[in-house]
Amino acid sequence: MIVLRNEICDKLENIAKILKFVRHCIGCEGINLEIENPQHHPSIELTQKCNLNCIYCYSRLKTVKRGIYGNLEEAETVTISQYGEPLLDLEGVKKAIEFCKDLGLRVDLQTNGTLLNEEIIKELKDLGLDLIMISLSSFSREKYKLLTGKDYFNRVLNNIKIASKYLHTIVRSIYIPGFNDNELLNLAKELNNYADEIMVHQLISYKENENLLKNAGIDLNNLGRIRDLLLIVDEMQKNAPKINVTIKGCLLVQLKEMDGFILNNITYDVFSEVPDIKREHRPLPW
């Protein structure tokens, strides 16, 4: 008899089974396998400008118009935003929150966290913001500067701690195997008493930023293994037992259906074309 399973297969299968969906993904069609062509939450795009220069970012590689993408009338949640740093247009963020709350929607804000302060966080909460996602993929000033081009690590970490006092706070981290493994483990340990959740994403490489990644010392041959992603998330969860450490829901729902042997051998396609928003566009109503 040929045995294709081993101890690591059982471990991976168990990790996928016990991982919980991040709150941002609740209500998204992407976690419903019965929907043939699922759509993610609609988004409101305010600007493509950003005060960081992240080496893995796709935002500067594609032109996206300001406006609403997707059907708000059929949605439960809207995301502000998926391109650029929305807090560069703080007044636009405030108007977007008010507009969406009038429609009875949950509002999730995605930001790099550099422009936050306690006053802004409290004001956004008072306007009805439900959830904030702050990007942080390192646990040192040096690695942060290498990834983003700026020296804002301490500011962002402090703003995460402030935000968690007022809002459901999710830290979004990019996992780069062989590059920031220990950084993420230490970050999880630090956030155990602050953030509510950490959502770990695999690094996606685009042709346009491939050289930037290589110049930073990232080995592109290490990217994409589901095995590595599940194992790092499991170790991060051990370091942060008080909070939920997980992966994006539309991937997790698929992995939960897979055998451990498949999980141990499957590779995610991390070499991609720059994403484009192929959804209905409407201008902002304000």
Curated annotation (Swiss-Prot):
Keywords: 4Fe-4S, Iron, Iron-sulfur, Metal-binding, S-adenosyl-L-methionine
Cofactor note (record): Binds 1 [4Fe-4S] cluster. The cluster is coordinated with 3 cysteines and an exchangeable S-adenosyl-L-methionine.
Residue stretches making up the Radical SAM core domain: 36-256
Cofactor: [4Fe-4S] cluster
Bilayer-crossing regions: none
InterPro entries to which the protein is assigned, alphabetical: Aldolase_TIM, Elp3/MiaA/NifB-like_rSAM, MoaA_NifB_PqqE_Fe-S-bd_CS, rSAM
GO molecular function: 4 iron, 4 sulfur cluster binding; catalytic activity; metal ion binding
UniProt-annotated binding residues for [4Fe-4S] cluster: C50, C54, C57
Keyword Iron: yes
SMART domains the UniProt entry points to: Elp3
Protein name per the record: Uncharacterized protein MJ0804
